[in-house]
Amino acid sequence: GKFQRAKPDAYRLMKTLRRGDLLFWEHTYRPVRKPPITHVMVYLGRDPQGRMWMAGSQGSRGVGIYEFRPKMKMGSYPWFLWFRREGKFIGYARP
C-alpha cells in the first residue's frame, strides 16, 4: 500500500485507520537510513470506549498489545548537547 503521512490527530485517525494498517514512527533510536522510520506497529481497531489499539513490540517488553495514542512519544536518543530527539508517529499504510 501507499504510505500516508499523518499528523498525530487522534480524532481524524479514528475515522481513517482500518484494522491491519501499519503505523510508522521515526527517530525511536538513532536512524541509519533515510527516511528515518525506525518502528512499525499494526493497528488493531477501537474498543467500545473508543480507545485505539495496536500490536507490536516496544523495547525489551516484547510483542504485545498497546493503546495507540498518536501524540505519545516513543523512544529517544541523544542528539545535540543535552537535547534528546524523541520518536514520534509519522503516518500509516495499508498493506
Locate predicted features.
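Low-complexity, Gly/Ser/Thr/Pro-rich intrinsically disordered linker/tail segments
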Residues: K71-P95
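A short, polar/proline- and glycine-enriched secondary-structure boundary/capping micro-motif
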Residues: V63-K71
